[in-house]
Amino acid sequence: MVERLTGRERQQALQSIAGWREVEGRDAIARSFVFTDFNEAFGFMTRVALVAEKADHHPEWRNVYKTVEVVLTTHDAGGVTRRDIDLAAAMNAIAGQFGVA
């Protein structure tokens, strides 16, 4: 089983993934991505879905028009783990392909 990050480890990791923040009241991290339109937002979600499925680690997310809101936590570990940080970094890289920093 993957280990939950300590508060210090989580803070250090968050510094390496732009735009992500801790979720108040939960051991989770979150970010909103805003794209040009729905097609880009859906394209982003499709690409992330392939990465998430391969990693067997799936986001909590929702999409409204051009905005995708994401929450990451590792339910089995009861909080944020390296798997969440890695998926967040992958999401940032995919968003970058659409010009979203």
Swiss-Prot record:
The keyword Lyase applies. Keywords: Lyase. It catalyses: (4aS,6R)-4a-hydroxy-L-erythro-5,6,7,8-tetrahydrobiopterin = (6R)-L-erythro-6,7-dihydrobiopterin + H2O. It is an enzyme of class 4 (lyase). One of its GO terms (molecular function) is 4-alpha-hydroxytetrahydrobiopterin dehydratase activity. One of its GO terms (biological process) is tetrahydrobiopterin biosynthetic process. Disulfide bonds: none annotated. The keyword Lyase applies. Its EC number is 4.2.1.96. It holds the Pfam family Pterin_4a. Belongs to the pterin-4-alpha-carbinolamine dehydratase family. This is Putative pterin-4-alpha-carbinolamine dehydratase. It comes from Rhodopseudomonas palustris (strain HaA2).
